[in-house]
Regions:
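PLP-dependent amino-acid enzyme catalytic core
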Residues: 1-340
Length: 340
């Protein structure tokens, strides 16, 4: 069972594994509220995921460690598991969807893991990881629906409360729900008056639909530039914790996410991946009731492939009206281009 004590224990265990990312004020982001950023894009491995995987692996039995670990991931959990497993001298195998950014794939290998590329999206990688677990007797490290993983992610909530106890609202992206489950449990346990909001991509609203239906819902297809939250179905544990602790969930479009990524680059000199920028997008485009409030947006990661980043920047420029694309029909005869 997830408790505040477990999250505090995770914080103690992880103190020499992770770095504490200090909250920074994001001036010029929003005129109606005070925006602060919890920059987990500056975390070791470039993402919050190392917190959950690090704590989970630290709690394995010697027999479980000896079998080696296997995980599935859109990229960030992969790096967290690879780093933590290598730290504890454990063999690791990671299944990634074949659409995962090359930067995340290479980083996972560099942290010491063997990588298995799987056709499809996260859920396909998940199924392949389960198959290999059964075939080769690995210990499976779930990316979000595990209480030790959730407790590790919850250490972010403790750090926010230690650094900014007067915060009014905390905003997190939601894919499978591990991050917001841990953060919301910590925040609400320490101060139930603080609002906790979740943000999903419009093209991958699995938690939104699950809350509407009263049970975890599986979406047939998902599509978003925010690959870190491109999940077809939330976890059973995370679904229950979101119902219990999270005040509301909103969705943002890929154009809005692109604009938030661009805003972070220009105003904060900070690189965020799509999932990391989603909370800021929700604030920027007035999706949340935070006028006049102190708001912490968790920038969950910064592992965005440079080729994707260039397209996202262009999309953000188009969204904000700073770049235009024109289509002109010309007759196929000499002199037409000169005339234009």
């Amino acid at each position: 069972m997830l408790t505040l004590d477990k999250i505090y224990h995770a914080s103690y265990v992880l103190k020499d594994v992770i770095r504490q990312t200090n909250i920074v004020q994001a001036r010029g982001i929003c005129d109606d509220c005070d925006v602060y950023l919890k920059p987990e894009n500056l975390q070791i491995t470039g993402s919050f995921k190392v917190r959950g995987s690090g704590y989970k692996i630290s709690q394995l039995t010697e027999e479980e460690k000896a079998r080696g670990v296997i995980a599935c991931s859109a990229g960030n959990h992969a790096q967290g598991v690879a780093l933590a497993a290598t730290k504890y001298g454990i063999k690791s195998l990671i299944c990634l969807p074949d659409g995962a950014p090359i930067s995340k794939v290479e980083a996972t290998k560099n942290y010491g893991a063997e990588v298995c590329m799987v056709p499809g999206v996260y859920d396909d990688a998940y199924n392949e990881a389960l198959r290999l677990r059964d075939e080769k007797n690995y210990t499976f490290i779930h990316p979000f629906d595990d209480e030790n993983v959730i407790a590790g992610q919850g250490t972010i909530g403790i750090e926010i409360m230690n650094e900014m106890p007067d915060v009014d609202a905390v905003v997190c992206a939601i894919g499978g729900g591990g991050l917001i489950s841990g953060v919301a449990c910590a925040i609400k346990s320490l101060n139930p008056n603080i609002k906790v909001y979740g943000v999903q991509a419009e093209g991958a609203p699995s938690m939104v639909e699950s809350i509407k239906n009263g049970e975890p819902v599986h979406l047939d297809s998902v599509s978003t530039i925010a690959d870190g939250i491109q999940v077809k179905e939330p976890g059973e544990h995370t679904f229950e914790y979101v119902k219990k602790y999270v005040d509301d969930i909103v969705t943002v479009s890929d154009d809005e996410i692109s604009s938030a990524i661009l805003k972070l680059i220009e105003s904060q000199k900070m690189i965020a991946e799509g999932a990391g920028a989603a909370p800021l997008a929700a604030v920027m485009f007035n999706k949340l009731p935070v006028k006049g409030k102190k708001v912490v947006c968790v920038v969950s990661g910064g592992n965005i492939d440079v080729t994707i980043l260039s397209r996202v920047i262009k999309r953000g420029l188009l969204m904000t009206g700073r770049q235009q694309t024109f289509c002109v029909e010309l007759q196929d005869k000499p002199g037409q281009l000169v005339a234009v």
